[in-house]
UniProtKB/Swiss-Prot annotation:
A zinc finger (C4-type) spans 25-48. The gene is ADAP2. This is Arf-GAP with dual PH domain-containing protein 2. Residues 9-131 form the Arf-GAP domain. It comes from Homo sapiens (Human). The keyword Repeat applies. GO terms for cellular component: cytoplasm; intracellular membrane-bounded organelle; mitochondrial envelope; plasma membrane. GO terms for molecular function: GTPase activator activity; inositol 1,3,4,5 tetrakisphosphate binding; phosphatidylinositol-3,4,5-trisphosphate binding; phosphatidylinositol-3,4-bisphosphate binding; phosphatidylinositol-4,5-bisphosphate binding; protein-macromolecule adaptor activity; zinc ion binding. GTPase-activating protein for the ADP ribosylation factor family (Potential). Binds phosphatidylinositol 3,4,5-trisphosphate (PtdInsP3) and inositol 1,3,4,5-tetrakisphosphate (InsP4). Possesses a stoichiometry of two binding sites for InsP4 with identical affinity.
Length: 381
């Protein structure tokens, strides 16, 4: 066996070795990484490899299976490995800092990788990282009633639990004052049409208000995202002092479980089917629907209780009802009414059913019960 095949075999064995963490990407956790940074000594996935290639001063990459590896580099990989390197570069990651997963957008992965290896923000011998307090800056915000993005000043007052934005740079009166209590932030790059697109949502007069923003700098928008998470953590610690920090972190921000177009009919189920954009918020157990994906407010919402309360989702349409263009139907049953929907494909239908049934089969939290009591009457729009 030549050096090439022998070292390839050693690397593949190292990928599968127990207690190394090598079986998953060191940066996003994707399974079965096929690439490695031989300058850092870690195994990474194809997507994260693309980020590493952009920073040759901190990382150099090779394919585990296709490139040649000499003995010294293989020994370096054996001496390091994912868990050892993560222990060094992720020694002090703040609880609020979002660690991207495999399906997250590129800007989150890029800034995570740069924060770790280029800026070395989380090493044990670095400066103490504290919760960010106030933050002020400019973001490009989409207009409520049009598609134009305009530069707006945003001010985060973490201790007061408030986010404000202003239409005038020197203005004293904010256009909106947003409570951190009801705020969520999620990257929606495809929907917004910008690689740094961030969607901020909050409750206003019983509705969900959507703000769509971006910044030209990837670092700036991710810093804003993590600052909002830090402010949320401060609020939750004060609101729930008896809960450990680890139980609060999952509630800092959340992604939609599923989004996409479906067609729906009205409450009488005789109205024409109309195309609507749906977003499933599993934490608040709400299915929101919009006329367009970038609308400022939802047209309506469905609170999703659980099976014991008479909620269910099933395949197909009620007898005698036919959809418009799309034939793959599903029906959501609530104590108040049925919601009859059609999906663009059977694949989408099954994905929606799986997501909806996952929510309906989970127990309600006290927050969910409060949401149900205050919003159940709003689902018929």
């Amino acid at each position: 066996m030549g050096d090439r095949e022998r070292n390839k075999k050693r690397l593949l064995e190292l990928l599968r070795a127990p207690d190394t963490g090598n079986a998953h990407c060191a940066d996003c956790g994707a399974a079965d990484p096929d690439w490695a940074s031989y300058k850092l000594g870690i195994f990474i996935c194809l997507n994260c490899c693309g980020v590493h290639r952009n920073f040759p001063d901190i990382s150099r990459v090779k394919s585990v299976r296709l490139d040649f590896w000499d003995d010294s580099i293989v020994e370096f990989m054996i001496h390091n490995g994912n868990l050892r390197v993560k222990a060094k570069f992720e020694a002090r990651v703040p609880a609020f800092y979002y660690i991207p997963q495999a399906n997250d957008c590129l800007v989150l992965k890029e800034q995570w990788i740069r924060a770790k290896y280029e800026r070395r923000e989380f090493m044990a011998d670095g400066e103490t990282i504290s919760l960010p307090g106030n933050r002020e800056g400019f973001l490009w915000k989409r207009g409520r009633d049009n598609s134009q993005f305009l530069r707006r000043k945003f001010v985060l007052l973490a201790r007061e639990g408030l986010l404000k934005y202003f239409t005038k740079e020197q203005g004293k009166s904010p256009k909106a004052v947003i409570s951190i209590k009801d705020l969520n932030a999620t990257f929606q790059t495809e929907k917004i049409g910008h690689p740094h697109g961030l969607q901020i949502t909050y409750r206003r007069d019983g509705h969900t208000r959507n703000l769509f923003v971006y910044h030209e700098s990837g670092k700036e928008i991710v810093d804003w995202f993590n600052a909002l998470r830090a402010a949320r953590l401060q609020y939750l610690k004060m609101a729930f002092p008896e809960l450990p920090e680890s139980e609060l972190v999952p509630f800092l921000t959340r992604n939609y479980l599923k989004q996409g177009f479906m067609e729906k009919t009205g409450p009488k189920q005789k109205e024409p089917f109309k195309k609507r954009w749906f977003a499933l918020d599993c934490h608040e157990r709400r299915l929101l629907y919009y006329k367009n994906p970038l609308d400022a407010f939802e047209q309506g919402q469905v609170f999703l209780g659980n099976k014991e309360q008479g909620y269910e989702a099933y395949e197909d349409l009620p007898k005698g009802i036919r959809g418009n263009r799309w034939k793959a139907g599903l029906t959501i049953v609530t104590p108040e009414r049925r919601f009859v929907l059609t999906c663009p494909s059977e694949k989408e239908q099954q994905e929606w059913l799986e997501s909806l049934r996952g929510v309906l089969s989970s127990p309600l939290t006290p927050l969910n019960r409060l949401t149900a009591s205050t919003e159940s009457g709003r689902s018929s729009r």
